[in-house]
């Protein structure tokens, strides 16, 4: 069985602030940890799909300076990802998913299109990168699609109709969230709200730039043991 694992990488800005750095310096360090996470996932044959929450719709309200630095970081890191031999050798399909793409610069949108096109026929593993996304909008977009509006008028809308129109089709099995908190909390922040209805959840109580491979191993052991106890 192959699992779908999600990552909510929280704490880049707080990590930077605590060190007297600019917010984007935290994002740069976080980018290194995304690369570590992807390498870790690729070492697990039972992980078939990965979804990473990089930028929510709400994040578009951040300063123009911070967003500009973020867009440049995405451009550099995604171009590097696209040239990785492992992506093509392992036939990993890359989906860049947005529920609001209007604020995204044109050059970045073109890069997204090239990545989708270049990997669209790959079917061994899937990597979903959520940029300008929120689960509430994804569900509303699905309900209000022309086909679903027609079905709702004529027959009534079913869950299968809604799921078929979602941008991420596969149920999420396990969500890892990072972020230093005074007490553990389960907060999805709009991440795959429909798809994660039955997902297991694990909180790493560290800012994302501080996480290690061992943290991911501990999280994965928790997930596998929990699933084993449930007989799944």
Where is each model-derived feature located?
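Flexible, compositionally biased loop and terminal segments
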Residues: 1-232
